[in-house]
Amino acid sequence: MRFNPGYRIKVGQREFSVTGRISYRGNDGSVWDEYSLRDSSGRTAWLSVDDEEGEYILSEATGLQHPPEGFSLYWQGSERVTGVSGRVDVEPGDEAVCSDYEDHSGRIYSVERWDDETEYSLGTILDPDKIIRISGGGVAGWMQN
């Protein structure tokens, strides 16, 4: 599943414009893409797509700086940006240390520690059939290392 900036997609009942794409490689060799999304009210969300593992997560920034009660650590490691397109605030070669937590209902809490900031997000694991491309759009330049 791959989208380009300018595409319109539907995730569950929400419609979004894809504004950017970041490709990552984890220190364990895993690869995945994250898409920056904007809904009609201007809110930003992120769609993480790992086709290899069959994992799809829609998340949004949160002010919570610690995992909520009932969440358990399920992945910890580092990620390296391998490619970008559209409007994103990272470059190929940037790295972060990450911790992902999950609760029994499939909610995800993530922490990404970059050189210049720490980001916290809450999300939900999705079935891939809940992610639908509505229309294609322009293709922004792709940068990778």
Predicted feature locations:
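Mixed-charge, low-complexity intrinsically disordered regions
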Residues: 1-145
